[in-house]
Amino acid sequence: METPFGALQLSRHKTAFSPAHKALFVADVHLGKAATFRSLGVPVPAGTTQENLDKLSECIAEFNPLSVYFLGDLLHAKMAHNPDLLGKLLAWRAQHTNLAMTLIRGNHDSKAGDPPASLNISVVEEPFMLGGFALCHHPQTVQNALVLAGHEHPVVVLN
């Protein structure tokens, strides 16, 4: 996909890659969401954290970025700061130590808290400028920039 600020390559795992910046963009990972729902009695499957991390690793292998930008909501809730999830996240991060990683804070990040410093993920506020791209969590207008944002989740209504 061509933009005024360079190409973006879209992946089947709902990420985007900027070849010019060697940057991978991913939004709304929501690690720990399934465990949070299960704790509230909602029957959702286990194992989604590892599946999501594996998909991210596939995207990293496919595009070979120098940096990964999380466009908000990396962690779903404070419950994500548990030994099991953080252990998986630390093991995943150890596989990708060569990559710079930045989290643009989203609405869930303010509730969940920043990722532990041991993950070596920088945390910034929106909009974060990368060339002509304004990296955000909440869709918004940024003058003279192309906004890359998350927050708006696809919705399916079942009758």
Residue locations for each model-derived region?
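Conserved beta-strand elements of the Class I
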Residues: 17, 23-26, 134, 146
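Flexible, charged surface loops at secondary-structure boundaries
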Residues: 17-19, 61-64, 97, 141-143
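Conserved beta-sheet core of the metallophosphoesterase superfamily
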Residues: 124-159
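Core catalytic region of metal-dependent phosphoesterases/phosphodiesterases
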Residues: 24-26, 33-129
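Zn-dependent metallo-beta-lactamase
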Residues: 1-22
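Histidine-centered active-site/metal-ligand motif
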Residues: 13, 30, 108, 137, ...
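Active-site/binding-pocket entry motifs
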Residues: 31-32, 141
